[in-house]
């Protein structure tokens, strides 16, 4: 499951060089159709339940696509791999990854978005509840190193001086909150396995609801593949949208398909996670604009916000370097309009 928000600028540059070494490796081919490999930055899990449903139910085959997920991990820079041309599409955990990549000159562009509202949140316990950003004043907030900029953004958005909050750098588990080392801790609301340790009464303060609007699980490709194979991307989006619609209508059956594909996953945990995931995958926007859509204005706000936070060492990227609506427009009538 994706947990890291986005790579550092150093890892983007280092990963780009490493990926070029393998750029000449042959792509997978099959009589089933045109290969589409989706590179992740993490180990495959519940975030890909829609793609797994589409694969196992034959939706990709209907589009003459031979689909495969390429898992990531701690030492795999998925953005750099896709940018090198080795694989056709990719998915990152959070939209800032693609803004930073565009700023560094990597030729990748977002063509659709999975989670319309990022499930990143600040978690607290009833003994010291944090329900609003103002409740953070005078408190210890545990945040991963890559998430420091988001805490800064949240505080600025809500008019809170940074020196009024004590920032504590933590790892990826929730233990510091349970032990009382911190009063709040960051994570994904969809990561129900990690949240178990907090018990049933924990509180979640979503980043999105408090002014910092990021996208999660955006899909991206290279500028070259976008130009040469828009029909393949459109087919990929149609099939994936059908898969997610199936998950929404049949969550338990979809979890069964997921666990059949990845037997290491725990069915009960994935059932708990899928209900949270569907809440951010399908919103009022998808009801009117279709699954996978995004608002260009939200993207521009993100670019402006990260520029104000001085995150673009190589310069602020232009909107058309970060995203394209071309494939969404091609599939406007085909993507499920569900909310």
What do these predicted regions represent?
Residues 299-339:
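Conserved C-terminal helix/tail region of periplasmic/extracytoplasmic solute-binding proteins
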Residues 228-311:
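Secondary-structure end/capping motifs
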Residues 69, 166-167, 179-180, 184, ...:
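A residue-level marker of the well-folded mature domains of exported/periplasmic proteins
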């Amino acid at each position: 499951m994706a947990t890291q928000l986005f790579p550092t600028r150093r890892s983007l540059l280092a990963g780009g060089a490493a990926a070029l070494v393998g750029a000449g490796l042959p792509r997978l081919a099959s009589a089933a159709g045109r290969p589409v490999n989706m590179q992740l930055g993490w180990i495959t899990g519940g975030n890909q339940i829609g793609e797994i449903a589409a694969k196992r139910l034959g939706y990709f085959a209907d589009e003459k696509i031979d689909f495969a997920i390429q898992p990531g991990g701690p030492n795999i820079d998925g953005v750099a791999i896709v940018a090198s041309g080795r694989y056709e599409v990719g998915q990152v955990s959070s939209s800032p990854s693609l803004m930073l990549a565009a700023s560094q000159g990597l030729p990748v562009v977002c063509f659709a978005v999975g989670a319309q509202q990022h499930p990143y949140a600040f978690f607290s316990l009833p003994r010291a509840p944090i329900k609003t950003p103002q409740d953070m004043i005078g408190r210890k907030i545990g945040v991963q190193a890559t998430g420091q900029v988001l805490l800064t953004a949240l505080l600025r958005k809500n008019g809170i001086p940074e020196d009024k909050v004590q920032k504590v750098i933590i790892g990826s588990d929730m233990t510091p909150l349970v032990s009382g080392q911190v009063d709040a801790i960051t994570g994904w609301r969809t990561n129900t396995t990690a949240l178990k340790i907090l018990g049933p009464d924990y509180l979640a303060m979503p980043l999105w609801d408090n002014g910092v609007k990021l996208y999660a699980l955006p899909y991206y490709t290279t500028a070259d593949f976008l130009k040469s194979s828009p029909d393949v991307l459109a087919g990929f989006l149609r099939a994936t949208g059908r898969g997610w619609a199936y998950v929404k209508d049949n969550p338990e059956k979809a979890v069964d398909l997921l666990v059949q594909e990845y037997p290491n996953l725990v069915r009960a945990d994935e059932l708990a996670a899928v209900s949270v995931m569907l809440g951010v995958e399908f919103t009022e926007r998808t009801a009117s604009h279709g699954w996978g859509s995004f608002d260009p204005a939200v993207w521009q706000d993100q670019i402006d916000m990260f520029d104000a936070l001085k995150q673009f060492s190589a310069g602020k990227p232009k909107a058309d370097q970060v995203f394209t609506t071309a494939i969404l427009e091609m599939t406007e009538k085909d993507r499920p309009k569900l909310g």
